[in-house]
Amino acid sequence: MVQKEKKFMRVKEMDDNSWRRVTGGYIGGSSHTSLLLNHNIRNKIIMECVGRLRSVDHDCIVVCGTSGLMVGPQVSEILQKNLVIVRKEHDNSYSDFCIEGAYSPRFVILDDLICSGKTIDYILRVIHNEYYRVECVGAYFYLQDQCAYQNCPEKFVTKYNINYL
């Protein structure tokens, strides 16, 4: 069987987006990751998250994946909330733990909602399987304009509770 050579996009082939240009270089990568790698845009996203989540009654912030780890730690630090990281399914990692961080009963999910939206279902399933008395009080989608769900109602969905029997 002949394997096709994987073609990688070259930086010069990318759209000429001004936000990709930074001091000393050009941010390469997928559009949503590149947005978060631009520190000016990432800081605006972080402050928007903080502003929206400050009044929400929760104990911790849950993230999953690389983009979540670019935003979640700063948001949780500013809000003085615990941070919980849920590893993606089949993640080849040095850790044997699927969930890492300080357990808290009321949590908010921070997610980019880029692909299929299955991350939210996965996070809820994993946390509810691990901990019995937890409540997801909401999910905040910080890249709504990049959202895979074009019919996404609003960025913060209060009482985003799913019961798993």
Predicted regions located by residue number:
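PRPP-associated nucleotide enzymes
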Residues: 1-165
